[in-house]
Structures are given as C-alpha cells and as structure tokens.
C-alpha cells in the first residue's frame, strides 16, 4: 500500500499536468478562432476564382492547358504523387493517425500504381521515411506560421512533377475542418484538375415556377439574364494564368482546413485530458483520505489495546 507521502506526490504531479493541459487547451482555442477566420476569408476568393474559371472554360479549348489533360489520369502501372498533410506535434487526438491511415489505405488499394509521397508535417514525414517510401517532397514547421507562400511551393512541386511526366496524377490527403468536435479525412485529386463546366451556359436562367425550372409554368414565363463578362486580356491568356493559381488556391485551402482541424483536435484532446486529470485527482484524494482514516483508526486501536493491557 502506498504511503500518504506517495499519494500526495502523485496528486501534485497530476495537478501540474492538468495545469499544462488547460493552458494548451486555451492556446489551441485561441489559435482555432484565428484559423477559422482565415478559412472564412479564403472561401470567397476560391469561390469567385472557380466562377471565373467556369466562365472562361466555355470560351477556350478544354484541352488547351496541360493541367487539364484527363488522359493522364493514373492507369494500371502509372505513378501517383500523394501529398499527406499532418502536424509537427502530437497531443491532438487522432488527427495525425487518421491522415496516415488514409494515405496507407490509398497505397494498399492501388497496388498497380507506383506511389511517391509529398510529406507536409513532421509526424507524417517520420512515419513514412522510416518505412522506406519514395519521398519526393517534404516540409515541416509549417503550421507555426502558415502563409500562402507555403501553398505556392507545394503547388509548384506538384505542377512540375505532373508537367514533366514524372507522375500521372497528384492527390491530396488532409483533415477537413467541419466543427470543433468533427474533422473529416479527405482524399482528393489535385492534378489533373477535375474537368470544369465546359458546357456553354444558357444566357438566361429560368425563374422558379417556369416549365424549364420544373415548376410547371409557361416555358417563357420569365427569365433573369446572366452576366456575360468582357475579358482583357484574351480568355485564353487569362485561363492559362489562372489555372496554376487555381492549383495554389486548392492547396492553400487544404492547408487552412488542416490547420483549423489540428487546433480543434488539440483543443478537444486537451479538454478531455483536463477532465480525466480532474477525475484522477478526485480518485486519489478519496484514496488518500481512506488511507489516512485507516492509519488513524489503527493508531486508536493500538492506543486502546495498550491501555487495556495496563
């Protein structure tokens, strides 16, 4: 049976750990708020860029850019570059484990393809490097000061590998932030870029209730004209310029999502650790009181027994 001194020492150690986990939870909560704000600021830009690209796609040759070459979709025996985004630290629940498992599953489910890896984050790098995988790109200490330039470097490495013919496709594996309690693993193709809306859009959109909208009304009940953009320079030049930027934006979005998901997972893990520490302190305190009560009772019995012997 441990002594009272040992129990008090354990209680002090658990309380010290609880203070650390509470502080880490507060720091993660603060950084999560900033990460959420950055996601909200980036989404309108990504949405408008996609809108412009969809408009440009109706005015140019769909095969005019090599990053749209669907014929380079990975085939049996083809080569894939898989970017895996993890964190540099632990204490974040299953954040790193889920990304690593998703990447490992992707590799196992594509036995006919040669998979090279681009590793973002120390945890993923350490895991795959120890197992002898073909690592083409690595970057660590990214979430500490995440900038758009980080996404540009990753996108540049992906585009160069794809356009040089080193790989047939590029995929991203990352944690998507949905809420503080929920993060979802995403495995999505980055290159070749999934085909945009190349169908020429109608210059008018049917109003709700019209026959074209499925409302059963007259066919020409009313229409709302769509905006037809005038481009300067030419649509072809803009399309060629914006396609690589679109790749950068998608990578940046994945980094922002992972950044927010990491802090959400860390905040949840530290909150759980703090609550577990509180329960452990309560249990140790109760046990300490029982041990002390037993010691007092034993001493009383010894005193009474000694008095009876006299």
Q: Predicted regions: what is each one?
A:
Residues 1-310:
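C-terminal beta-strand-loop-alpha-helix "lid" module of Rossmann-like NAD(P)-dependent dehydrogenases
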């Amino acid at each position: 049976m441990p002594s009272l001194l040992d129990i008090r020492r354990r209680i002090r150690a658990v309380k010290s750990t609880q203070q650390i986990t509470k502080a880490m939870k507060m720091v993660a909560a603060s950084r999560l708020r900033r990460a959420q704000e950055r996601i909200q600021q980036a989404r309108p830009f990504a949405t408008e860029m996609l809108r412009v690209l969809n408009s440009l796609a109706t005015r140019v040759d769909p095969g005019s850019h090599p990053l749209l070459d669907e014929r380079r979709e990975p085939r049996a025996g083809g080569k894939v570059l898989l970017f895996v985004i993890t964190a540099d630290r632990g204490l974040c629940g299953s954040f790193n484990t889920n990304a690593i498992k998703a990447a490992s599953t992707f590799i196992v489910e594509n036995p006919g393809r040669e998979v090279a890896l681009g590793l973002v984050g120390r945890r993923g790098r350490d895991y795959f490097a120890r197992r002898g995988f073909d690592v083409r790109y690595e970057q660590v200490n990214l979430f500490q000061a995440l900038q758009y330039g980080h996404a540009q470097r990753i996108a540049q490495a992906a585009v160069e590998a794809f356009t040089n013919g080193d790989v047939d496709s590029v995929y991203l594996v990352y944690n998507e932030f949905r809420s503080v309690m929920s993060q979802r693993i995403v495995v999505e193709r980055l290159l070749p870029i999934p085909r945009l809306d190349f169908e020429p859009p109608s210059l008018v959109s049917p109003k709700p209730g019209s026959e074209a909208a499925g409302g059963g009304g007259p066919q020409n009940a009313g229409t709302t004209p769509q905006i037809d953009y005038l481009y300067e320079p030419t649509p072809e030049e803009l399309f060629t310029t914006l396609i690589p930027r679109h790749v950068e934006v998608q990578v940046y979005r994945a980094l922002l999502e992972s950044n927010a998901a990491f802090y959400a997972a860390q905040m949840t893990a530290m909150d759980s650790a703090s609550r577990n520490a509180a329960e452990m302190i309560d249990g140790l305190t109760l046990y300490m009181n029982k041990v002390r009560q037993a010691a007092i009772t034993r001493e009383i019995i010894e005193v009474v027994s000694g008095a009876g012997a006299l």
